Amino acid sequence: MIESLISVAFYISTAVTLLLFLLPSRYDPRRFDRLKKDASIAPKTTTQILVLGDIGRSPRMQYHALSIARGGGQVDLIGYNESEVHPDISSNPRISITALAPHPTFLQTSNKLLFLLFGPLKVAFQIVCLWWALAYRTEPAQWLLVQNPPSIPTLAIASMASFLRHTKLIIDWHNFGYTILALKLGDRHPLVRFSKWYEKSFCRYATAHFCVTEAMASILKNHFGLTAPILPLHDRPASHFQPIFDQSEQKSFLESLPETAPVKDLLQAGSLRVIVSSTSWTADEDFSLLIDALCRYSNLANTSKPALPAVLAIITGKGPQKEMYLKQISKLQEAGKLSKVTIRTTWLTTDDYARLLASASLGISLHTSSSGVDLPMKVVDMFGAGLPVLGWDRFQAWPELVTEGVNGMGFGSSGELLDHLVDLFENPSKLEKIRTGARKESNRRWNDEWDPIAGKLLGLA
């Protein structure tokens, strides 16, 4: 009997010891306060920023990192390191990148039957990588700033890691994960309902919340019932998005792009208009709207409105539906339905993308907003470069970003988009009016928005 009790005690003590040994180290504010006395080496705060996605394609989270570092904080940026990050990120000694391991290639499949098998394995792999990064690969931090969506499994893992490491959790709401899932499955699907419950449950563990619109803040307060501070933090362009006022500089840059080679003569003659659209090639951006409008524009330019200028549409971005649309565009070109329009896709460096926006005639946003209360960052960047915008406007938060007829115009169909293109390209004075409004909007900058809201919360302003 005694030997049995001793054995049980041994196993229990071993299990407890192992558990304590495996617990992640905790943030100690007293130790941090002692370090802060030596201002020459100690940061004002320490922050982990988590992006369950490609860091290079998450501009807002990169801007958070740069602002924290500018204020004297230390940042550990956690996410997939697939695309080129902002050059100031990689050169800043106060910012380090902890790259998440990509999914093993054998788990990546388009086969629906294999997806049912590999799907749970991919989620399990993701959970392990997230937990390992948040709990063991990084030092404990005062704050953990998490991008949402994606919410699964991010919010649960982040909540647990924050609790165990004595870290304050902040959720930066870009949209709602369950509304994006509903685009594919429908509002009543069990997975959508579970996703909504999950999101509403785990977000309650956050110390504070940032969100991209006032409308989103209202939903978080009134429908999610959150009592922690909810701070609307509107997107604003980073400093490298600036207008180019010299037309010869604009023209010179456009001529340097490989994408303009087929229409260089038209560009030099001034009979070409360049439009730019940045898309994620996903279900919440109906690219067929733009294709249809451009086909109809080409037809008008060939028939009843021969004075319309030719158009070069430069499309940037990566995503799952890209190849599908490229095949569709190729067929339309072969059929002669885009004779007055040239469509080119590209992926540019951060600086070249900013210069492209500053040199183009119009920006196009196809973002339809699954929730109705998020806003497209791409429009913010366009305004930063002084580029007027035509965008899908059938959602609640659109007026928080675009002032109709002042810095851009909204549309709700390909026909309305076509009407705007024809009107603006037939009447240069109207285009110049909204360009002036966009350049005025470019004066509103990220740091001006960030400092009194996020900077104040983090103790950096």
For every predicted segment, state its role.
Residues 305-308, 315-317, 322-355:
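Nucleotide-activated donor-binding/catalytic signature segment of Leloir-type glycosyltransferases, i.e.
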Residues 258-285, 291-295, 314:
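Conserved donor-binding/catalytic core segment of Leloir-type glycosyltransferases
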Residues 285, 347-356, 361-383, 391-400:
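Nucleotide-sugar-dependent
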Residues 66, 153, 160-164, 171, ...:
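Membrane-proximal helix-turn-helix segments that form the acceptor-binding/catalytic region
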Residues 412-416, 426-461:
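A charged, aromatic-enriched C-terminal amphipathic alpha-helix characteristic of glycosyltransferases
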Residues 204-205, 210-211, 216-253:
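Helix-loop-beta element that forms the nucleotide-linked donor phosphate-binding surface
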